[in-house]
Amino acid sequence: MNQIEPGVQYNYVYEDDEYMIQEEEWDRDLLLDPAWEKQQRKTFTAWCNSHLRKAGTQIENIEEDFRNGLKLMLLLEVISGERLPKPDRGKMRFHKIANVNKALDYIASKGVKLVSIGAEEIVDGNVKMTLGMIWTIILRFAIQDISVEETSAKEGLLLWCQRKTAPYRNVNIQNFHTSWKDGLGLCALIHRHRPDLIDYSKLNKDDPIGNINLAMEIAEKHLDIPKMLDAEDIVNTPKPDERAIMTYVSCFYHAFAGAEQAETAANRICKVLAVNQENERLMEEYERLASELLEWIRRTIPWLENRTPEKTMQAMQKKLEDFRDYRRKHKPPKVQEKCQLEINFNTLQTKLRISNRPAFMPSEGKMVSDIAGAWQRLEQAEKGYEEWLLNEIRRLERVEHLAEKFRQKASTHETWAYGKEQILLQKDYESSTLTEVRALLRKHEAFESDLAAHQDRVEQIAAIAQELNELDYHDAVNVNDRCQKICDQWDRLGTLTQKRREALERTEKLLETIDQLHLEFAKRAAPFNNWMEGAMEDLQDMFIVHSIEEIQSLITAHEQFKATLPEADGERQSILAIQNEVEKVIQSYSIRISSSNPYSTVTVDEIRSKWDKVKQLVPIRDQSLQEELARQHANERLRRQFAAQANAIGPWIQNKMEEIARSSIQITGALEDQMNQLKQYEHNIINYKNNIDKLEGDHQLIQEALVFDNKHTNYTMEHIRVGWELLLTTIARTINEVETQILTRDAKGITQEQMNEFRASFNHFDRRKNGLMDHEDFRACLISMGYDLGEAEFARIMTLVDPNGQGTVTFQSFIDFMTRETADTDTAEQVIASFRILASDKPYILAEELRRELPPDQAQYCIKRMPAYSGPGSVPGALDYTAFSSALYGESDL
């Protein structure tokens, strides 16, 4: 077997087409590139399988499956559609070589000269030789026949691709390698021929692998083109294999070119059929139009020949209008149809003659001459029809005018007379008031005048009916019947009018009598009703009294009211008698009117009901007044009981307040003696609490009884409560002040004599004796004690004794100031010096030093309130004791 050395290349030459001579980039470089070899192996395998599957087989390994020559021969038979010589079935090497040679001989018979490709290399599985052989087959059977504008093979296929993809953005096909790397070219080919399979607008040029895979998947699924390329190989190879791409793209050409050829053949057939169908359509259209036109003529002629006169003007006018519509609307389109029918007939005959078709022969009776004859008969029937219509209309016009005049007058009279009989038959006066009856009588007089005015119209109606009978009006029977009904009704209206007048006059006299009785009733019932309403209001009036005298006055007034009841009852009976007389008259003459009084809104039932109500309220009022009298007696007892206690408690509280005040300002004796005296006062006050509680109980009873005044005492419970609470507050405050004075005296080293002197000075300048000095009193006090004060110094002292700026100085503030002025006190500097000792002369102190030197609670107090130290030499956790000490004495903003 001959081996192909690395530098050896195979060649193939077509006898008839020199463009197939090998090229350097197609043979030498391609077969030496492993990447290209991989692409060719996959593409050629897929291409072979796309044809072998038609024979129910396929290959897996291109260099192995063609070694025995059997599938190679089968591939050529499927591609060419021709039968090759019968293969050898042996499995020996020479059998395989013989089969491969048969295949190569067949290729050579198609005008392809195989150079350097021998059967032995194929049988030995030489990959490069096998790929070269398959490429030769692809060129001959898949690419050679491609021709676009006299170009062939590769150039033709490239030109076809360029034209198909020219309209697409980002697609520029210049070769069969790099121009296809982004996949948009394949997608554009599919979209150009099958836009339903792919949405080109959604493709992304930056996704070449996705584009290639999408195109191959759609081609495999919808175009029956198997996947022949590997998207990653195409994208990742600088220059993809040209043969592989040409092979795959040629499949698109054959898939779409076959469809175009079929479309061309179908268009040719459709064109021929369209001409024939158009001729048939014109024939059918002629037959249809001719039939419709002849049918219209057949229906119209009898209508035009009909001269039967109508009985009414409207019917004749309808005939005239129909004829005018015929001339204006119906006939012109038919004239156009007749003309168009002749044109269509001539056009059809011309088309048939040009297209070598036999002449058109309409069905029997539908020739152009038949249509012309029918049209002539139509125009003959049309003559004179309009003149006959106008004469008949003039004849009916006079009769119709009289008939319309009769109808108008009859309708006017009937409209006027409608409901008149029912009105005259009404007995509405039987249930009407006098005013309403008088109005009905005046209304009836107006009707009688109207009735007389309509006499002329009735006579005119009868005269017109007579004339229509003489003119032999077609509807004379109905006219006579209507006229007779009008005359009969007229006679009845005259009779009913006279009877109604008599009834109205009789009813008027009866109602005048009733009206006088109603007026008398109204004059007497209204005052009596007002009296009863006032009485009921007084009897139900809610009285509010606060003394026995007030309730006694109400009882006296009620007794006086009861004395007037017999006289009122007599008036009530007189009023009821008037109403009874009214009802007697109504029943005697069967007058169906309401017994209600038009002059009064007061009814008999209302009078009876209110009188009964008055009689019921009198004893109820008696009982309420007596109960209130008893309640006022009980309230008076409560007032006296409360007053007795309040008049004793009030002065007692006042006395105790005065005793405490005197004790608080005394300047003799020791503070301890003063404290003992105040404690005794406090004990006595607490023991007096039972009297306050008892008074509270009596006050609760008074409140429950709704007693709001008490003339027996000037003390109210609120006064007692305020005095008692003030007493408790005063004794507690006074005791606290003495305790504070003792504490201050002991803490500051003040002697009792000094304390007494301070008290004497404060009491002297406490001009209002309320335990407070204002600014001027305080200044005078200081001056009396030897202080020579300027404004600035006095202002400083005031901030000490009146820190809240209330404008007053208490005794305790005065004592604190005087003790600071006379005693030895600690200062912020002393406290800072003490903290500096604990901190070992550092400007800051640590928390552990505070916990070590101070009690736990005081150490925690300092740690919580001391600010952090941020001065020189600061360490983490350093605390500023200087700022803290200044804050203790009000010398800092902390």
Swiss-Prot record:
Q: Which UniProt keywords apply?
A: Actin-binding, Calcium, Cytoplasm, Metal-binding, Phosphoprotein, Repeat, Ubl conjugation
> CDD domains under this entry?
CH_ACTN_rpt1, CH_ACTN_rpt2, EFh, SPEC
Q: What is this protein called?
A: Alpha-actinin-2
Binding annotation for Ca(2+) 2: 802, 804, 808
The chain's coiled-coil residues are: none
Residues in Spectrin repeats = 281-391, 401-506, 516-627, 637-740
- Organism equals Bos taurus
> Which positions are annotated as binding Ca(2+) 1?
766, 770, 777
Calponin-homology (CH) domain: residues covered: 38-142, 151-257
Question: Which gene is this protein's source?
Answer: ACTN2
Subcellular location(s): the record lists: Cytoplasm, Myofibril, Sarcomere, Z line
- Molecular function GO terms recorded: actin filament binding; calcium ion binding; channel activator activity; FATZ binding; identical protein binding; LIM domain binding; phosphatidylinositol-4,5-bisphosphate binding; titin binding
The record's comment on protein family reads: Belongs to the alpha-actinin family.
Q: How does it assemble?
A: Homodimer; antiparallel. Also forms heterodimers with ACTN3. Interacts with ADAM12, MYOZ1, MYOZ2 and MYOZ3. Interacts via its C-terminal region with the LDB3 PDZ domain. Interacts with XIRP2. Interacts with DST (via N-terminus). Interacts with PARVB. Interacts with SYNPO2.
